[in-house]
Amino acid sequence: STQDTHHTMLIALAETRRDCVAFMSPYRSATVGVALSSTATQNVIDAFNLVPSSSYAVFDSGYKYMFDKYNDVFRFVPLNGDIAGLCAFTDQVADSFFSPAGFNRGNVRGAVKLSYNPTKAERDQLYRARVNPVTNFPGQGVVLFGDKTALTKPSAFDRINVRRLFLLLEKAIATAAKFQLFEFNDEFTRAQFRNL
């Protein structure tokens, strides 16, 4: 489908650049207007099963209902922008190697409600399928309750914070290494690089 093609192209772009992560939500009809929570869960899992494995992508579970102040209406909006925003917020209040999920840094703002609110069992299903559930906890707000990347096999890189840490490290090492170009390849130069 077109959705899978877009997701695959975004992943290919992120993997080619190797300096970013693609945040993706399921197609709108997977959760918006779906009466049964179990059906919405299966729709989300099915949507992302067609997308290739990658540590450069992050999947979320749906849409939030929010006020669109520019058009003066309430509407459902995909959560991928919010998840990217939580990563930026985490950088601001902590560091890239902290998880953007949970009650400390994973609060999704501006949500009136979710297109569907997965139960604990459904959250477990989603998490096993590489999807980060976003859940409304009564009295505590809407929270990103997972920190997986879209990688299918177990690895350190199947966590958002680990992938983001390595993006930061790779960039820092590349910046430092360029100043060692055309220098003598001797013990002094190597020690200087190690001690940067």
Spans of features found by a protein language model:
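Structured, hydrophobic secondary-structure cores that serve as assembly/anchoring elements
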Residues: 1-196
